[in-house]
Amino acid sequence: MNITLNGEDRVLDSAKTLSELVESLGLDVRKVAIERNLEIVPRSAYGATNLADGDRIEIVHFIGGG
């Protein structure tokens, strides 16, 4: 499946949901916000949101600092 992730074309072999994508990237699902095809996806829906060929995904990872 081909998607665009943060502006870069990617080919996915295994990730089928947003949760699986986040895990495959080594990110903490509690510390990211995801936009799919210009729509913000609620964190509670990551596991139920299936990826589709051609999806445009933007992931923002929150980090602490001061």
Question: Where on the chain are the PLM-derived regions?
Answer:
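Short alpha-helix capping/helix-loop boundary micro-motifs
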Residues: V41-Y46
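Eukaryote-biased recognition of intrinsically disordered, low-complexity regulatory segments
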Residues: M1-G7
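Short, contiguous acidic and Ser/Thr-rich linear segments
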Residues: G7-K16
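Short amphipathic, charge-patterned alpha-helical segments
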Residues: K16-L25
